[in-house]
């Protein structure tokens, strides 16, 4: 049957041979009667069809209207996001660059962090606001006295401080030696009932541990909670410049133990530098490392694990196969060997601090030829396994072949090709340009230090530029002079399609200025905000552009330290360029830097813990960048920076990354980039950036097309003319005139 009916034809019959009777259910019809019914039935069917078409049209209209309303909601949401972004940046322009966004009313950075995991909100529920970078003042304690001032405390007081530190999710991550020094360097402070210990909005640079008494925490007059003995408060202030986000008042007479930021930084930096230098010194004595570059030895030092063995423990047993190398950090080990024909193992020698054993195991499977036994009370060793060693060094055959050859040339580090020499200096045409020649056309962005304006030179609007104006007084107040000069010097040194060009710098009594290449496609962050997230193809293109820029910087021993979509600009061509080099720094080969700076959601664990960092911090940020492009938000994000740092220290493996947008291959790349140990991150090995390019996520990607700009970009921004700023948010004029600044720090800018 081609249809269905509630009736069916039961039978056909003929009474006289001419008339046919048809029985339908309980009724009988003659054929001609049924024939008369056909037009009526067809008309009824036609009416039903018309009704169905009408209903379908109504439904389609409703669907269309729903779609229109969804579009209006999306448009309104984007406008709200834009307005929120503008308002937040406007607020930041009057605040310290180190001040993070205000936390939610129910949280603060004064107490201990709650146990939590990073939870990704449902689609479309998150509010996208620009992320704010933070920075401590640049520090260098290498030439400062080796001793720190210690303050007397009772045994009970020291234990109370240690217990408070161990309960704090951030501070408990510090090394044992650092915690001991931190406790010794804290000094006593007392406050009477009713006295304010911390006031909201004031700059903060001290951490407190409550020893006795009770305090009340409030924000904007509303009580948030109380703090009692054994509580840590203000830990964000020992990391970088920030303003207090809440007030703390003593309810009773209180006793506090206090640590200044400068002392905390000196403790972490000095001990970290001493440990790193000591390991490098140990490694330089090992014959198979003798001809490695200082940079490569430094990376080996980064990946060495620290282990402790009690006295009497066999670290190695004769006859076992080994794949690890050991350096004695403290204590002693006894070397014994079983000699054929002798019942007892013969003692060969005692090894002390700085001695090493097992180095041949790094070159291949080695049968241990002796026992290594920890001596009482115990021994601390630094360990390097063959897998980590191979990733850093590359071709082991080179080491095997040249082992012990003092004349050997170091060929283990991949030498990138030198950048192509630029024939024409693009800055020459700006040699005679002064501020008087520059005309402002529109505002492209605002921030804590100043504004970025679209400008033209000598009234020629056919060519436009970006003028970055930075308030000198604000720079001095936040002690960022060194960072600003570093930005100028690094950008003057660079010349590549992957980095915005700096043409010239100026200064007057109120500002220092940078005349920059303009990218009228706008910030990648704005495009990401409006689209919600990017697919695999789009994200891969923008990650590849960043990778080209990072490789260029790393070849010059420059660490970028502020990768995020906000600092990626779209050129008219749709290709990406890095901008904002305020945190970039040029490092000596094999050396680290120690200043806490970056964007909270993007900083690596070693920056948070002030262990010293290098270019590997950029590879961590690259992993976070991939996540944000594909998920629409960074993977580590919480209600305040301190909680964000706690999530980061828990590691990428603790993340619950939703796979609805980011596939297994991209997730695998993120986890290889975001390893806790900097030396284990993809890109830090002997293959450098090429190891990242070879990852499966980039399989089939046209790298040559990217470099020659023949690869079609996924998004082509609409730019109508050189003065078109429609791809940027609208900003109100700035009527706030900063005071003059005459200290002279900008001489030669």
Swiss-Prot record:
Q: Which residues form a coiled coil?
A: 30-96
Annotated residues that bind 3',5'-cyclic GMP 1 are located at 234-237, 244-245
What EC identifiers does the entry list? Answer: 2.7.11.12
Record CDD domains: CAP_ED, STKc_cGK
The record places the active site at 562 (proton acceptor)
- Relate the protein's function as given in its record: Promotes chemoreceptor gene expression in response to increased cGMP levels by antagonizing the gene repression functions of the class II HDAC hda-4 and the mef-2 transcription factor. Regulates gene expression via recruitment of a histone deacetylase complex containing hda-2, saeg-1 and saeg-2. Represses body size and lifespan through the dbl-1 and insulin pathways, respectively. May also signal through daf-3 and/or daf-5. Role in egg-laying, dauer formation and motility. Regulates behavioral responses to various chemosensory stimuli in sensory neurons.
What protein does this entry describe? cGMP-dependent protein kinase egl-4
Q: What species is given as this protein's source? A: Caenorhabditis briggsae
